[in-house]
A protein has these predicted regions:
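Generic recognition of short, well-ordered alpha-helical interface segments
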Residues: 22-25, 60, 64
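Short, aromatic-enriched amphipathic alpha-helices that serve as compact interaction elements
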Residues: 19-36
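A beta-strand edge to alpha-helix "cap/lid" segment located at domain peripheries
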Residues: 2-18, 67-163
Length: 163
């Protein structure tokens, strides 16, 4: 399992320009961070003045990132995420993703989306643009069952799951 300091070191050690292999590693480390559901840990891989658009919400800087993620994971319970590389070039990476979660009434959702990332020279994300759609699902339709935290290496990705 990756400890936060190792993951943070690895995330920032992968610097532009990206190769296919380094972009895949960057995507997996981002997935691992978000699956930790630790807003402070996640915020440290973004620049101090990072700019986000997440759905219709605009977030600026690490402090707002922590507040945003704290609200997000208080609402999106039992959150499990899979990210997959879509495209990359120089200092940019595009991913597609899906995550499953339920609300406090027990209603399950699978959220699908795309993110565009831009990194600084140190490998920290300086811009993040996310478009996300929520699909209500039944508990029987769930596909992400690993224990909370990092997705096991042998768990299928989005393409293998047909998502």
């Amino acid at each position: 399992m990756l400890f936060s300091t190792q993951a943070e070191f690895s995330m920032s050690a992968l610097v532009p320009p990206f190769t296919r292999e380094s972009a895949i590693q960057k995507v997996r480390l981002a997935e691992d961070g978000w699956n930790s559901r630790n807003p402070e840990r996640v915020s440290r891989v973004y620049t101090p003045d990072s700019q986000w658009r997440n759905r219709a919400e605009f977030v600026s800087g690490r402090e707002e990132i922590v507040c945003f993620l704290t609200r997000k994971w208080a609402r999106e319970l039992d959150y499990r995420l899979i990210k997959e590389l879509w495209a990359f070039g120089d200092n940019r990476i595009a991913v597609r993703f899906a995550y499953e979660w339920h609300d406090d009434s027990g209603n399950w959702f699978r959220s699908f989306g795309n993110e565009n990332w831009e990194f600084d020279k140190q490998g920290l994300m300086q811009q993040r643009f996310a478009c996300i759609n929520d699909l209500p699902i039944s508990a029987d339709d769930r596909k992400f069952f690993w224990p909370l935290g990092r997705r096991p290496d042998d768990h299928p990705g989005l393409s293998e799951l047909g998502l």
